[in-house]
């Protein structure tokens, strides 16, 4: 794990939900959970950028969540990872480096 991922996992206020299909939103209670917690932005990480991450990004954007994908905390097929990240950046949300995202979070705490 990168140091950025380690920083995120140190937090005690995160929840884990089990993904059953290509999107974390289907068929789960994730949307209900996020809405009940008042969460409007989702940060997506994981493997299969060109499949599961992008499917979850589409579903999140279609449900009016703001999508952020840390490019260094995802992995995909060799030839499809970068095109998937470009598609997310063009149509679905923000693609950033995890250190920049953590820096933004830290500055919001101050």
Q: PLM features: residue spans?
A:
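Alpha-helical scaffold elements lining the catalytic groove of polysaccharide deacetylases
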Residues: 18-43
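Anion (oxyanion) recognition and catalysis
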Residues: 61-62, 89
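Active-site-proximal loop->helix
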Residues: 76-91
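Residue-level detector of anion-binding/catalytic polar loops
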Residues: 40, 66, 94
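Short glycine/serine/threonine-rich phosphate/pyrophosphate-binding segments
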Residues: 50-56
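Single conserved hydrophobic/aromatic residue that forms the stacking wall/gate
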Residues: 1-5, 9
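A short glycine-rich beta-strand->turn/loop micro-motif centered on a GG-aromatic cluster
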Residues: 43-47, 66-78
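A charged, well-structured terminal subsegment
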Residues: 17, 94-110
């Amino acid at each position: 794990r990168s140091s950025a991922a380690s920083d995120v996992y140190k937090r005690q206020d995160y929840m884990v939900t089990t993904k059953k299909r290509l999107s974390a939103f289907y068929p789960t209670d994730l949307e209900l959970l996020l809405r009940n917690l008042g969460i409007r932005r989702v940060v997506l990480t994981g493997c299969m950028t060109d499949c599961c991450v992008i499917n979850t990004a589409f579903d999140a954007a279609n449900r009016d969540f703001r999508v952020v994908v840390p490019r260094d905390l995802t992995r995909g097929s060799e030839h499809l990872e970068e095109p998937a990240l470009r598609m997310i950046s063009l149509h679905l949300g923000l693609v950033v480096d995890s250190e920049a995202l953590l820096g933004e979070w830290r500055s919001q705490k101050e």
